[in-house]
Amino acid sequence: TVNTDGSYNFTLQGPIDHAPNSDELILNFPIIATDFDGDSTTATIPVTIVDDKPTITDVDAISVDEDDLATIGSDQSNPVSIDGNFTTTQGSDRVVSYQLDGSATPVDGLKSQGVDVTLAETANPDGSFTYEATAGNSAVFTLTVNPDGSYNFTLQGPIDHAPNSDEL
């Protein structure tokens, strides 16, 4: 709405599609001001629409016990596989997937029995992503992130710890 005093109001009444990987869209509304004797001038009313983003909160901290791996052989009283959840607040666009940040390096410097750990991602038909960590040919852990915000971590092999440390 443009008022006679030159002020204007823009009301967004629903979501607007943005270009892929774009967080804002600029709409330029050309306006003409004309006076009583017909003189006119033009300008543009720029309206920037910022795309809201989803937020992730309440990420469950999980803990597994390496000494309960079958190959280690302790009392098997603690889990080596555990489920967790996180909460997502969606913006006007629905969340279509959850996966690890490709620019992050969560296993950098991680070793299992002296061998560097590498992480491989698999996109599954159900929309989940599975991350398999290996050291050479040995499985170290698997992380599956599901489309509903739940995840499962399964420890499959030992992880090297700092001297005199039991936790990583």
Can you say where each PLM-predicted feature lies in the sequence?
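Acidic/polar, solvent-exposed loop/turn segments
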Residues: 1-168
